A protein has these predicted regions:
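Short, ordered, surface-exposed loop/turn motifs in non-cytosolic proteins
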Residues: 130-133
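ASCE RecA-like P-loop NTPase motor cores
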Residues: 1-124, 128
Length: 133
C-alpha cells in the first residue's frame, strides 16, 4: 500500500466512498477535489479493491491529465481517446485514433489494465448506425 493510500484510509470521507464502492453502489462520485487529488483517491480505491476502474471526465484534456497522474501512481492505465473530428471532405484520413481505441478495447478484453479513463464526449458520440438510418 502506498503512503498516500495509508493517509486516505484514515479519512471518514474516503471510508464512506470505499464502502459505497465495496457494496456495489455505483457509480461512485467525489466532488471538490483537485486533479491530483482525484488521481490519489482513485489510486487508493484501486489499491483497496484491486478491481479495474472506469473513470469519466468532463472533457478530453481532463482525461489526458488524469491518465498521466494515475500512471505515475499505478501501471496499466488506459486512455480511451475521443474520435478525431473531420469537418471537411479529405482524400485520405488517418486511422490513428481508431487504432488507439481498438488497442484500448483489446487490452480491456485481455484484462491488462487497472483503469480506463475517458471523457463524457463519448456518451454524446453518435454511432454510425444511427447516422445511416
Amino acid at each position: 500500500m502506498s503512503c498516500f493510500s495509508g493517509i486516505l484510509n484514515q479519512s471518514d470521507a474516503f471510508a464512506s466512498l470505499n464502502r459505497a464502492w465495496t457494496t456495489g453502489s455505483r457509480p461512485v462520485g467525489a466532488v471538490g477535489l483537485s486533479e491530483t487529488g482525484k488521481a490519489l483517491v482513485l489510486h487508493a480505491l484501486y489499491e483497496q479493491q484491486r478491481k479495474p476502474l472506469l473513470v469519466l471526465t468532463p472533457d478530453e484534456a481532463s482525461a489526458v491529465k488524469l491518465t498521466e497522474d494515475l500512471r505515475t501512481l499505478q501501471g496499466d492505465v488506459l486512455l480511451y481517446p475521443a474520435r478525431e473530428m473531420n469537418f471537411v471532405q479529405v482524400a485520405g484520413a488517418s486511422h490513428e485514433y481508431e487504432l488507439l481505441r481498438l488497442d484500448v478495447l483489446s487490452r480491456m478484453a485481455a484484462g491488462a489494465y487497472t483503469a480506463v479513463v475517458l471523457s463524457l464526449i463519448h456518451i454524446s458520440e453518435p454511432t454510425r448506425l444511427a447516422l445511416i438510418s
